[in-house]
């Protein structure tokens, strides 16, 4: 039973990863989020890794600072299977987007892409990425 105390709960890990995702989407540092909450960046790290649980009132504060509803942190949570959530294709697609935006490259690509205002340039960039992906698949 001692092992369970040292192993983070999957829900805590998920909530932490969603905090990290939203924080990085906003370009906010752990230090800045910690300052806004009156805690250290180390505590933010522990929340994001799921090693420390985020209390309800703290999660409410985090949601206000990151400008998302509290429910955002529980979207696609483990054990949240089924009947009332989005369809399987939607959940799969949602997880793919979360994984993409959780990576450093994905976040950089997203930030750069949204700065491109010309729709023709955006379309050409999407076509280029699709061509590169198709080439990589055929190898």
Swiss-Prot record:
<feature type="DNA-binding region" description="H-T-H motif">
    <location>
        <begin position="30"/>
        <end position="49"/>
    </location>
</feature>
<feature type="domain" description="HTH cro/C1-type">
    <location>
        <begin position="19"/>
        <end position="73"/>
    </location>
</feature>
<dbReference type="Pfam" id="PF01381">
    <property type="entry name" value="HTH_3"/>
</dbReference>
<keyword id="KW-0805">Transcription regulation</keyword>
<dbReference type="GO" id="GO:0003677">
    <property type="term" value="F:DNA binding"/>
</dbReference>
<dbReference type="InterPro" id="IPR001387">
    <property type="entry name" value="Cro/C1-type_HTH"/>
</dbReference>
<keyword id="KW-0804">Transcription</keyword>
<protein>
    <recommendedName>
        <fullName>Uncharacterized HTH-type transcriptional regulator R00410</fullName>
    </recommendedName>
</protein>
<keyword id="KW-0238">DNA-binding</keyword>
<dbReference type="InterPro" id="IPR010982">
    <property type="entry name" value="Lambda_DNA-bd_dom_sf"/>
</dbReference>
């Amino acid at each position: 039973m001692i092992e369970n105390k040292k192993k983070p709960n999957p829900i805590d890990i998920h909530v932490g990863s969603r905090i990290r995702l939203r924080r990085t989407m906003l370009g906010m540092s752990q230090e800045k989020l910690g300052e806004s909450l009156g805690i250290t960046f180390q505590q933010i790290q522990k929340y994001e890794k799921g090693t420390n649980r985020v209390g309800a009132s703290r999660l409410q504060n985090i949601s206000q600072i990151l400008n998302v509803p509290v429910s955002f942190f529980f979207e696609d949570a483990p054990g949240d299977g089924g009947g009332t959530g989005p369809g399987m294709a939607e959940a799969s697609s949602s997880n793919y987007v979360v994984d993409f935006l959780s990576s450093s490259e994905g976040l950089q690509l997203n930030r750069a892409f949204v700065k491109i205002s010309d729709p023709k340039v955006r379309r050409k960039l999407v076509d280029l990425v699709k061509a590169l992906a198709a080439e990589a698949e055929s190898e």
